[in-house]
Protein backbone atom coordinates (compact mmCIF):
# COMPACT_ATOMS: atom_id res chain seq x y z
CA UNK A 1 0.00 0.00 0.00
CA UNK A 2 1.38 3.39 -0.88
CA UNK A 3 2.70 5.18 2.19
CA UNK A 4 0.59 8.10 3.25
CA UNK A 5 -2.54 6.72 1.61
CA UNK A 6 -5.60 7.87 3.48
CA UNK A 7 -7.16 4.87 5.17
CA UNK A 8 -10.90 4.64 5.32
CA UNK A 9 -12.53 1.79 7.15
CA UNK A 10 -15.58 0.07 5.79
CA UNK A 11 -18.38 2.31 6.97
CA UNK A 12 -19.85 1.02 10.21
CA UNK A 13 -17.89 -2.24 10.17
CA UNK A 14 -15.89 -1.69 13.35
CA UNK A 15 -19.04 -1.32 15.42
CA UNK A 16 -20.70 -4.18 13.58
CA UNK A 17 -17.90 -6.61 14.37
CA UNK A 18 -18.07 -5.65 18.04
CA UNK A 19 -21.85 -5.94 18.19
CA UNK A 20 -22.99 -9.48 17.48
CA UNK A 21 -26.65 -8.43 17.64
CA UNK A 22 -26.45 -5.97 14.78
CA UNK A 23 -29.08 -6.72 12.16
CA UNK A 24 -27.90 -7.48 8.62
CA UNK A 25 -29.88 -4.52 7.35
CA UNK A 26 -27.64 -2.20 9.39
CA UNK A 27 -24.47 -3.40 7.70
CA UNK A 28 -23.21 -0.86 5.17
CA UNK A 29 -20.60 -2.01 2.70
CA UNK A 30 -18.21 0.12 0.66
CA UNK A 31 -14.60 0.28 -0.50
CA UNK A 32 -11.81 0.72 0.36
CA UNK A 33 -11.65 -1.21 3.63
CA UNK A 34 -8.65 -1.37 5.95
CA UNK A 35 -8.81 -3.00 9.35
CA UNK A 36 -7.49 -0.97 12.27
CA UNK A 37 -3.74 -1.41 12.68
CA UNK A 38 -4.01 -2.81 16.21
CA UNK A 39 -6.05 -5.72 14.79
CA UNK A 40 -3.40 -6.68 12.21
CA UNK A 41 -0.67 -9.33 12.58
CA UNK A 42 1.83 -6.93 11.01
CA UNK A 43 2.09 -4.10 8.48
CA UNK A 44 -0.20 -4.61 5.50
CA UNK A 45 1.56 -5.75 2.31
CA UNK A 46 3.07 -3.07 0.13
CA UNK A 47 2.28 -3.16 -3.58
CA UNK A 48 5.82 -4.17 -4.50
CA UNK A 49 5.58 -7.16 -2.12
CA UNK A 50 2.44 -8.35 -3.87
CA UNK A 51 3.85 -7.78 -7.35
CA UNK A 52 7.07 -9.69 -6.58
CA UNK A 53 5.73 -12.37 -4.24
CA UNK A 54 7.64 -15.62 -4.70
CA UNK A 55 5.09 -17.86 -3.01
CA UNK A 56 1.76 -18.47 -4.65
CA UNK A 57 -1.08 -20.80 -3.75
CA UNK A 58 -2.80 -23.22 -6.11
CA UNK A 59 -6.31 -22.39 -7.25
CA UNK A 60 -8.99 -24.57 -8.81
CA UNK A 61 -9.83 -21.75 -11.23
CA UNK A 62 -7.90 -20.16 -14.06
CA UNK A 63 -5.93 -17.33 -12.36
CA UNK A 64 -6.82 -15.01 -15.23
CA UNK A 65 -10.44 -15.21 -14.08
CA UNK A 66 -10.40 -16.49 -10.51
CA UNK A 67 -7.53 -14.27 -9.40
CA UNK A 68 -3.96 -14.78 -8.23
CA UNK A 69 -3.23 -15.97 -4.69
CA UNK A 70 0.07 -15.03 -3.06
CA UNK A 71 1.42 -15.39 0.47
CA UNK A 72 3.13 -12.42 2.09
CA UNK A 73 5.46 -12.96 5.07
CA UNK A 74 3.42 -15.98 6.22
CA UNK A 75 0.96 -13.43 7.59
CA UNK A 76 -1.28 -12.60 4.68
CA UNK A 77 -2.86 -14.15 1.63
CA UNK A 78 -3.61 -11.64 -1.11
CA UNK A 79 -6.15 -12.54 -3.76
CA UNK A 80 -6.17 -10.11 -6.65
CA UNK A 81 -7.21 -9.69 -10.25
CA UNK A 82 -9.64 -7.84 -12.51
CA UNK A 83 -12.38 -10.43 -12.01
CA UNK A 84 -12.00 -11.03 -8.28
CA UNK A 85 -15.35 -10.44 -6.58
CA UNK A 86 -15.94 -8.08 -3.67
CA UNK A 87 -18.48 -10.56 -2.35
CA UNK A 88 -15.71 -12.75 -0.89
CA UNK A 89 -14.44 -9.94 1.32
CA UNK A 90 -17.92 -8.94 2.43
CA UNK A 91 -18.73 -12.59 3.17
CA UNK A 92 -15.65 -12.88 5.41
CA UNK A 93 -16.75 -9.80 7.36
CA UNK A 94 -20.26 -11.20 7.65
CA UNK A 95 -18.92 -14.54 8.93
CA UNK A 96 -16.76 -12.81 11.51
CA UNK A 97 -19.75 -10.87 12.77
CA UNK A 98 -22.35 -13.63 12.72
CA UNK A 99 -20.54 -16.95 13.20
CA UNK A 100 -17.74 -18.68 15.08
CA UNK A 101 -16.39 -20.92 12.35
CA UNK A 102 -12.84 -21.32 11.01
CA UNK A 103 -12.50 -18.91 8.10
CA UNK A 104 -9.88 -16.29 7.20
CA UNK A 105 -10.23 -12.79 8.59
CA UNK A 106 -10.41 -9.94 6.12
CA UNK A 107 -7.69 -7.33 6.73
CA UNK A 108 -8.08 -5.09 3.69
CA UNK A 109 -9.99 -4.82 0.43
CA UNK A 110 -9.38 -2.13 -2.16
CA UNK A 111 -9.01 -1.44 -5.85
CA UNK A 112 -5.79 -0.46 -7.57
CA UNK A 113 -6.19 0.43 -11.24
CA UNK A 114 -8.38 -2.33 -12.72
CA UNK A 115 -7.75 -4.97 -10.04
CA UNK A 116 -9.49 -5.80 -6.78
CA UNK A 117 -7.20 -6.79 -3.90
CA UNK A 118 -8.46 -8.89 -0.99
CA UNK A 119 -5.94 -9.13 1.86
CA UNK A 120 -6.79 -12.02 4.16
CA UNK A 121 -5.39 -13.90 7.11
CA UNK A 122 -2.88 -16.59 6.19
CA UNK A 123 -3.93 -19.90 7.75
CA UNK A 124 -1.35 -22.70 7.43
CA UNK A 125 -2.65 -26.05 6.27
CA UNK A 126 -3.07 -28.42 3.37
CA UNK A 127 -6.21 -29.14 1.41
CA UNK A 128 -8.47 -31.98 2.41
CA UNK A 129 -8.43 -33.15 -1.19
CA UNK A 130 -4.67 -33.68 -1.00
CA UNK A 131 -4.81 -36.08 1.95
CA UNK A 132 -8.29 -37.61 1.69
CA UNK A 133 -7.32 -40.80 -0.20
CA UNK A 134 -4.71 -41.73 2.43
CA UNK A 135 -6.70 -40.82 5.56
CA UNK A 136 -7.64 -43.62 7.97
CA UNK A 137 -11.37 -44.05 8.48
CA UNK A 138 -11.32 -42.85 12.08
CA UNK A 139 -9.71 -39.55 11.06
CA UNK A 140 -12.23 -39.13 8.23
CA UNK A 141 -15.00 -39.55 10.80
CA UNK A 142 -13.50 -36.84 13.01
CA UNK A 143 -13.16 -34.39 10.11
CA UNK A 144 -16.66 -35.06 8.82
CA UNK A 145 -18.04 -34.43 12.30
CA UNK A 146 -16.25 -31.10 12.48
CA UNK A 147 -17.53 -30.13 9.05
CA UNK A 148 -21.06 -31.16 9.98
CA UNK A 149 -20.91 -28.83 12.97
CA UNK A 150 -19.52 -25.93 10.91
CA UNK A 151 -22.17 -26.17 8.22
CA UNK A 152 -24.93 -26.69 10.79
CA UNK A 153 -23.91 -23.41 12.42
CA UNK A 154 -24.03 -21.65 9.06
CA UNK A 155 -27.40 -23.11 8.19
CA UNK A 156 -28.85 -22.17 11.58
CA UNK A 157 -28.64 -18.44 10.87
CA UNK A 158 -32.13 -16.92 10.62
CA UNK A 159 -33.39 -16.36 7.10
CA UNK A 160 -33.14 -12.70 6.01
CA UNK A 161 -36.12 -13.11 3.70
CA UNK A 162 -34.25 -12.87 0.40
CA UNK A 163 -31.98 -14.86 -1.91
CA UNK A 164 -28.80 -12.98 -2.80
CA UNK A 165 -25.44 -11.83 -1.50
CA UNK A 166 -24.62 -10.91 2.10
CA UNK A 167 -24.93 -7.27 1.05
CA UNK A 168 -28.50 -7.91 -0.15
CA UNK A 169 -27.19 -7.62 -3.69
CA UNK A 170 -27.41 -9.95 -6.70
CA UNK A 171 -26.93 -13.69 -6.30
CA UNK A 172 -23.12 -14.09 -6.39
CA UNK A 173 -23.04 -17.07 -8.72
CA UNK A 174 -22.35 -17.36 -12.44
CA UNK A 175 -25.72 -19.06 -13.04
CA UNK A 176 -27.23 -15.63 -12.32
CA UNK A 177 -24.92 -13.54 -14.48
CA UNK A 178 -26.34 -11.00 -16.90
CA UNK A 179 -24.16 -8.68 -18.96
CA UNK A 180 -27.02 -6.19 -19.05
CA UNK A 181 -27.57 -6.47 -15.30
CA UNK A 182 -31.12 -7.76 -15.81
CA UNK A 183 -32.52 -7.99 -12.25
CA UNK A 184 -34.84 -10.82 -13.31
CA UNK A 185 -31.66 -12.89 -13.77
CA UNK A 186 -29.29 -11.42 -11.19
CA UNK A 187 -31.63 -10.88 -8.27
CA UNK A 188 -31.78 -10.46 -5.35
CA UNK A 189 -35.08 -12.28 -5.02
CA UNK A 190 -37.69 -12.35 -2.29
CA UNK A 191 -39.44 -15.41 -3.74
CA UNK A 192 -37.90 -18.79 -4.50
CA UNK A 193 -40.12 -18.93 -7.58
CA UNK A 194 -38.26 -15.94 -9.02
CA UNK A 195 -34.90 -17.51 -8.09
CA UNK A 196 -35.84 -20.57 -10.14
CA UNK A 197 -37.23 -18.51 -13.01
CA UNK A 198 -33.91 -16.67 -13.16
CA UNK A 199 -32.09 -19.91 -13.97
CA UNK A 200 -34.42 -20.48 -16.92
CA UNK A 201 -33.88 -16.90 -18.08
CA UNK A 202 -30.12 -17.32 -17.85
CA UNK A 203 -30.42 -20.48 -19.94
CA UNK A 204 -32.46 -18.63 -22.55
CA UNK A 205 -29.86 -15.85 -22.63
CA UNK A 206 -27.05 -18.36 -23.25
CA UNK A 207 -28.89 -20.12 -26.07
CA UNK A 208 -29.85 -16.80 -27.63
CA UNK A 209 -26.20 -15.73 -27.61
CA UNK A 210 -25.45 -18.92 -29.57
CA UNK A 211 -28.10 -17.99 -32.10
CA UNK A 212 -30.30 -20.97 -31.23
CA UNK A 213 -33.64 -21.54 -29.58
CA UNK A 214 -33.33 -22.86 -26.03
CA UNK A 215 -35.65 -25.84 -25.84
CA UNK A 216 -34.13 -26.78 -22.51
CA UNK A 217 -34.80 -23.19 -21.39
CA UNK A 218 -38.47 -23.74 -22.12
CA UNK A 219 -38.41 -26.93 -20.04
CA UNK A 220 -36.74 -25.15 -17.13
CA UNK A 221 -39.22 -22.28 -17.30
CA UNK A 222 -42.14 -24.72 -17.22
CA UNK A 223 -40.94 -26.90 -14.36
CA UNK A 224 -38.24 -25.35 -12.14
CA UNK A 225 -40.52 -22.93 -10.26
CA UNK A 226 -42.82 -25.73 -9.10
CA UNK A 227 -40.17 -28.46 -8.75
CA UNK A 228 -37.84 -26.28 -6.67
CA UNK A 229 -40.11 -24.75 -4.05
CA UNK A 230 -40.44 -24.61 -0.29
CA UNK A 231 -36.76 -23.92 0.47
CA UNK A 232 -35.91 -21.08 2.85
CA UNK A 233 -32.98 -18.71 2.21
CA UNK A 234 -30.02 -20.37 3.93
CA UNK A 235 -26.49 -19.07 4.40
CA UNK A 236 -24.39 -21.08 1.96
CA UNK A 237 -20.70 -21.39 1.11
CA UNK A 238 -21.57 -22.39 -2.43
CA UNK A 239 -18.40 -24.23 -3.46
CA UNK A 240 -17.85 -27.25 -1.22
CA UNK A 241 -14.81 -28.73 -2.93
CA UNK A 242 -12.32 -30.61 -0.78
CA UNK A 243 -9.75 -28.14 -2.12
CA UNK A 244 -11.61 -25.38 -0.26
CA UNK A 245 -11.15 -27.11 3.09
CA UNK A 246 -7.82 -26.67 4.87
CA UNK A 247 -6.67 -29.16 7.49
CA UNK A 248 -3.78 -29.25 9.95
CA UNK A 249 -2.14 -31.90 12.12
CA UNK A 250 -2.77 -31.76 15.86
CA UNK A 251 -2.06 -34.16 18.69
CA UNK A 252 -5.09 -36.00 20.06
CA UNK A 253 -5.35 -35.03 23.73
CA UNK A 254 -6.51 -38.52 24.70
CA UNK A 255 -4.40 -40.88 22.60
CA UNK A 256 -1.44 -38.61 21.98
CA UNK A 257 -1.57 -39.59 18.31
CA UNK A 258 -1.35 -36.90 15.65
CA UNK A 259 -4.43 -36.53 13.46
CA UNK A 260 -5.83 -34.02 11.01
CA UNK A 261 -8.38 -31.43 12.10
CA UNK A 262 -10.16 -28.64 10.24
CA UNK A 263 -8.05 -25.48 9.97
CA UNK A 264 -10.34 -23.33 7.81
CA UNK A 265 -12.96 -23.17 5.10
CA UNK A 266 -11.70 -20.92 2.30
CA UNK A 267 -12.89 -19.42 -1.02
CA UNK A 268 -16.11 -17.67 -0.01
CA UNK A 269 -16.49 -15.95 -3.39
CA UNK A 270 -20.00 -17.26 -4.07
CA UNK A 271 -21.24 -17.29 -0.47
CA UNK A 272 -24.66 -15.84 0.20
CA UNK A 273 -28.30 -16.66 0.80
CA UNK A 274 -29.54 -19.51 -1.38
CA UNK A 275 -32.39 -22.01 -1.17
CA UNK A 276 -31.64 -24.63 1.48
CA UNK A 277 -30.90 -27.33 -1.11
CA UNK A 278 -28.18 -25.32 -2.90
CA UNK A 279 -25.12 -26.27 -0.82
CA UNK A 280 -25.65 -29.96 -1.58
CA UNK A 281 -27.43 -29.59 -4.89
CA UNK A 282 -24.79 -27.44 -6.57
CA UNK A 283 -21.82 -29.62 -5.63
CA UNK A 284 -23.60 -32.86 -6.59
CA UNK A 285 -23.10 -32.49 -10.39
CA UNK A 286 -19.39 -31.89 -9.78
CA UNK A 287 -18.74 -35.17 -7.97
CA UNK A 288 -16.24 -37.43 -9.74
CA UNK A 289 -17.64 -40.65 -8.21
CA UNK A 290 -14.19 -42.22 -8.01
CA UNK A 291 -14.00 -42.52 -4.21
CA UNK A 292 -16.13 -42.19 -1.06
CA UNK A 293 -16.36 -38.38 -1.09
CA UNK A 294 -19.94 -38.13 -2.50
CA UNK A 295 -21.16 -40.44 0.27
CA UNK A 296 -19.10 -38.55 2.85
CA UNK A 297 -20.72 -35.24 1.92
CA UNK A 298 -23.99 -36.74 3.15
CA UNK A 299 -22.38 -36.81 6.60
CA UNK A 300 -21.76 -33.07 6.33
CA UNK A 301 -25.04 -31.97 4.73
CA UNK A 302 -28.47 -33.48 4.58
CA UNK A 303 -28.80 -34.66 0.96
CA UNK A 304 -31.34 -33.21 -1.44
CA UNK A 305 -31.24 -35.88 -4.17
CA UNK A 306 -34.21 -34.72 -6.24
CA UNK A 307 -33.11 -31.10 -6.26
CA UNK A 308 -29.53 -32.22 -6.97
CA UNK A 309 -30.66 -34.24 -9.98
CA UNK A 310 -32.39 -31.17 -11.39
CA UNK A 311 -29.30 -29.04 -10.82
CA UNK A 312 -27.25 -31.62 -12.69
CA UNK A 313 -29.52 -31.03 -15.67
CA UNK A 314 -29.18 -27.27 -15.14
CA UNK A 315 -25.38 -27.55 -15.06
CA UNK A 316 -25.31 -29.51 -18.31
CA UNK A 317 -27.51 -26.87 -19.92
CA UNK A 318 -25.63 -23.80 -18.67
CA UNK A 319 -22.04 -25.00 -18.87
CA UNK A 320 -21.79 -27.24 -21.93
Residue ranges and their predicted role:
Residues 44-45, 140, 153-238, 248-260:
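An alpha-helical support segment within catalytic cores of ATP-dependent transferases
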Residues 49, 53-189, 232:
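ATP-binding pocket architecture of kinase catalytic cores
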Residues 60, 83-86, 214, 291, ...:
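Conserved phosphate-coordination/catalytic loops
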Residues 9-16, 22-23, 32, 299, ...:
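Charged phosphate-binding loop/patch that engages nucleotide di/tri-phosphates or the phosphate backbone
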Amino acid sequence: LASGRVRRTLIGLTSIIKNKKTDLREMIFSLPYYRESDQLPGPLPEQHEIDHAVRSLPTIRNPDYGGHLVVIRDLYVVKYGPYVAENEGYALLFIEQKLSIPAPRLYAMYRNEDKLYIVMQYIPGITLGHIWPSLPENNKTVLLGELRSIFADMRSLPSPGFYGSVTQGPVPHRYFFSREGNPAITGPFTKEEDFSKAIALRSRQIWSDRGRHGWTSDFLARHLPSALSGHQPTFTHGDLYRENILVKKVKNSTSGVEEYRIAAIIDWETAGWYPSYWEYGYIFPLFQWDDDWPESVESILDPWPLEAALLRFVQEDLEF
